[in-house]
């Protein structure tokens, strides 16, 4: 075995990664890499083991591997739209699956419906919206230092077991004072939007494949996808 793919529910990711590092295996692991503080600290320790052993560890933050994003973000980092004023991030989609509770022990219920339990999933922001938030961090070359948010559980009725919320809105602040405005939702019969956008002093971009300037011709990515 040369490498392993870690794609189980993310609550198990840190212990699986630590075992793979102990066995000297290269790893591709899906996002998120962990769902809580202890898990993150374990992953950071495993990263150091990978460095010491010369192993490769790749994570499934997919936009960093998509050529249109790579080209567009590189231009944004070079100052194509001037100073970044604010960023927007969205993952608004339909309702998430639930496999029911009948005929199962409490632990079986949580395993079958892992997306609905925070200890194993991390909830929507951590498990899925991380893709969009990662684009903001990528552009800024930094992580937020503050967050102000709210959310709730509206579409998931009392007959749906679990702890997850189905909608969130969070405002993140980066060290230089730039804000990222975030929305994510998993509710049926609502408008969907999965996207990012950045507004600067000289233009704006969808972060993915185009940049529009206050003056001059826009940029459009036309290379390989």
Residue ranges of model-derived segments:
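Phosphate/diphosphate-binding loops
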Residues: 180, 186-188
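N-terminal glycine-rich "phosphate-gripper" loop used for MgATP/nucleotide binding
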Residues: 8-11
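Predominantly a Rossmann-like dinucleotide-binding segment in NAD(P)-dependent oxidoreductases
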Residues: 52-59, 63-162, 172, 188-190, ...
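Acidic surface patches and DE-rich sequence motifs
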Residues: 174, 200, 213
């Amino acid at each position: 075995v040369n490498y392993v793919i870690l794609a189980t529910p993310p609550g198990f990711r840190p212990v699986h990664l630590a075992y793979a590092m102990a066995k000297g295996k290269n790893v591709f692991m899906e996002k998120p890499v962990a769902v809580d503080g202890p898990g993150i600290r374990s992953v950071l320790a495993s990263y150091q083991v990978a460095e010491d052993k010369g192993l490769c560890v790749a994570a499934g933050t997919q936009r960093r591997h998509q050529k249109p994003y790579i080209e567009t973000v590189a231009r944004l980092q070079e100052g194509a739209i001037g100073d970044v004023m604010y960023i927007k991030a969205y993952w608004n989609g339909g309702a998430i699956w639930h496999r029911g509770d009948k005929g199962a022990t409490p632990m079986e219920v949580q395993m079958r419906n892992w997306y609905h339990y925070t200890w194993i999933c991390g909830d929507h922001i951590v498990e899925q919206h991380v893709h969009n938030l990662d684009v903001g961090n990528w552009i800024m070359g930094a992580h937020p230092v503050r967050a102000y948010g709210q959310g709730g559980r509206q579409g998931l009725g009392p007959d749906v077991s679990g702890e997850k919320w189905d909608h969130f809105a969070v405002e993140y602040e980066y060290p230089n004072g730039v804000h990222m405005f975030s929305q994510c939702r998993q509710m049926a019969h609502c408008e969907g939007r999965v996207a990012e956008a950045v507004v600067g002093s000289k233009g704006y971009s969808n972060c993915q494949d185009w940049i529009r300037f206050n003056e001059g011709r826009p940029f459009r990515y036309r290379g390989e996808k």
